[in-house]
Amino acid sequence: MAAKEIIFHDGARAKLVEGVNLLANAVKVTLGPKGRNVVLERSFGSPVVTKDGVSVAKEIELADKVQNIGAQLVKEVASKTSDAAGDGTTTATVLAQAIVREGQKYVAAGLNPLDLKRGIDKAVAAAVDELKKISKPTTTSKEIAQVATISANGEESIGQRIAEAIDRVGKEGVITVEDGKSLADELDVVEGLQFDRGYLSPYFINHPERQLAVLDEPFILLHDKKISNIRDLLPVLEQVAKAGRPLLIVAEDVEGEALATLVVNNIRGILKTVAVKAPGFGDRRKALLEDIAILTGGQVITEETGLTLEKATLQELGRAKRVEVGKENTTLIDGAGDKPNIDARVKQIRAQIAEATSDYDREKLQERVAKLAGGVAVIKVGGATEVEVKEKKDRVDDALHATRAAVEEGIVPGGGVALIRVKQAIAALAGANADQKAGISIVLRALEEPLRQIVANAGEEASVVVATVAAGQGNYGYNAATGEYGDLVESGVLDPTKVTRTALQNAASIAGLLLTTDATVHEAPKDAPPTAPAGVPGAGAGGPGFDF
């Protein structure tokens, strides 16, 4: 086991605070509409230019071990805030730095760190309660666009795209962000349920100009096993042919004589069919087939429920208004499933989301909810260069997460004003002792910091602006984009309540841990030069006694 080095008391805290400041100073220059860019080096390829706080934080590793511990703790603030709310990482970092900086002064002066932390926690709890009181629900597309615009650093086109996407697919719909292939941003919306499996043979194509197989008013056969023997399929094929409707087959696989017979019948015009593989694998495949069955009003033909292909009837088949099958995707439009059954299925999946332990599982379950309840929109981010597209894509991701947070918990006035307004609720608090009172005052001072940083990044005098905003009431604040004072809600400067709340709670949590730290244990440097004995004159590179 490698040797460890231990640092105690003020020496440990001072080093940790240095690390906090190094990371926070690099991140906070990006805050606000006039925030600056940060350039990140890449081992391979072009450097990345970004205004995304969490992207900057994730890149930082410091050479000094103890400083790096401090930096990593603040990085955790940014990451946790990003995971929970999707935005507000820079605000969280600025708040954490402010609480640590003010708290360190009190600890150095001999106050009890644990009482300071209790005071900080009490003040933050009061601030969160007040934030919830001043929060207002998002009701209009305009408000959604404004929230997205602010989070995208004032780019209105991004805000409008996201608002349009939510309008099209609903609040339950999935919105994904991809690299575009043109200079302009594009929005693609998929109606109905789409899964990533295409036709098993190009001979099913009946729209050659679009390379699609399109079926109008088809029956839909869902099977969880491979189909290779045509005799298994014949009874149901005959029933579908008599009904004079096309057929979509979704199975684990369709191969051999079964596939060949379907292709021949399709070419001859005897029965219009398309066969595709079922999406997913294992248990997820079964769940997705069941989703499709509920959406189309059919049943999955599976031995588990006692159903077999040979005995399948039209009653077990699903229906849809239209099906479009491409090389890689299948889209079911306007399935014939009953709404109560679909709603019950959505409720069941939501319960699974609440219990999911991994982000991957949660994401896949959320996709299933969206496909059943809403739709899927894809925002394709355009730009002249790869670097520009990457930077813009980061901002679109932030804006998208901020919008979801606003829909979830509502909105408060932006530009750091909401945190100024909650100070009144904290100022009335009484601590159990003088040290707790000092902890409350730490939070009171820290709540001004995001506004101070926004103003400083805009090149204005922070103290003057903070005093002017504090003298106002309600939504009155400073719009750094225009350099004017006024009603921020009316001018569209909004923040999601969830983002502001999460940033404050996470910042206070990590800052409290740093202030109550009294020792650090870290790996000793491996190639540290031998320390010269005290009192030897001229000890250095030239050796004892030599003076250069």
Swiss-Prot record:
Biased composition regions of type Gly residues, renumbered to the chain: 537-548
Keyword Repeat (UniProt): no
Xref: CDD domains: GroEL
Keywords: ATP-binding, Chaperone, Cytoplasm, Isomerase, Nucleotide-binding
Molecular functions per Gene Ontology: ATP binding; ATP-dependent protein folding chaperone; isomerase activity; unfolded protein binding
Intracellular or extracellular location(s): Cytoplasm
GO biological process, one term: protein refolding
Cytoplasm in keyword set: yes
Entry-linked InterPro entries: Chaperonin_Cpn60_CS, Cpn60/GroEL, Cpn60/GroEL/TCP-1, GroEL-like_apical_dom_sf, GROEL-like_equatorial_sf, TCP-1-like_intermed_sf
Residues covered by region (Disordered): 524-548
Annotated Gene3D superfamilies: GroEL (3.50.7.10), GroEL-like equatorial domain (1.10.560.10), TCP-1-like chaperonin intermediate domain (3.30.260.10)
One term under GO cellular component: cytoplasm
One Pfam family recorded for the sequence: Cpn60_TCP1
Catalytic activity: ATP + H2O + a folded polypeptide = ADP + phosphate + an unfolded polypeptide
The family this protein is said to belong to: Belongs to the chaperonin (HSP60) family.
Protein name: Chaperonin GroEL 2
